[in-house]
Amino acid sequence: PAPTGSIIINDTDTLAGSMGFEVTLEGQGGHGSRPEKCIDPINTGVHVYLALQELIARECPAISETALTIGQFCAGSASNVIPETAVLQGTMRSFDEKTMAHLIARLNEIVPSVAEAYRTKAEIEVISDVPIVRCNEELNQEIVEGLKELEPELKAVCAYHVMGSEDFAYISQKIPAS
């Protein structure tokens, strides 16, 4: 929160770009008493999850504002049955388009490779794709100056980046936004 009598403003990038994705892994279900007759998509999903976590740790600069989250991992309906499918849903977020492009390319390499290694089929679906929210510096300055005319004691506080995303980004790509 900003101190009373101030306005929070960001000169350029405000909210991260984000891509939501879903990975569906298809194996061969069966009874837990005969795992050798099955192809376990949960096992594949665990390996996909671990491989994707390594992207942030080993392929993104330590100072980059980048996040990859698997927030949902669903499979099966009984404790003694190996399911036929497993589904992982997640998001990638970054303030750098090159980093985001790298993560997307690696997602598309890693998931099929891991799936093949564990004899499952993989499908990747993009659920959402939201660009970075970019504020227009000139418009920001105009707004601050206009507000200071109304309230001379107003202080402009520069905000830090927020890893959240917002579809307002599409508007800020078309017209100057603040």
Residue spans for each PLM region:
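Histidine/acidic-residue-rich, glycine-tolerant segments that coordinate divalent metal ions
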Residues: 1-83, 165-166
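Short, hydrophobic beta-strand segments
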Residues: 23-27, 86-94, 124-128
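Divalent metal-coordination and catalytic microenvironments
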Residues: 31, 45, 90, 143, ...
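Structural signal for hydrophobic packing residues in well-ordered secondary-structure cores
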Residues: 49-60, 111-119, 147-151, 175
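Flexible, glycine/charged-enriched surface loops at secondary-structure junctions
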Residues: 57-67, 114-125, 153-161
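An extended, acidic, His-containing surface patch that forms the Zn2+-binding/catalytic region
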Residues: 125-178
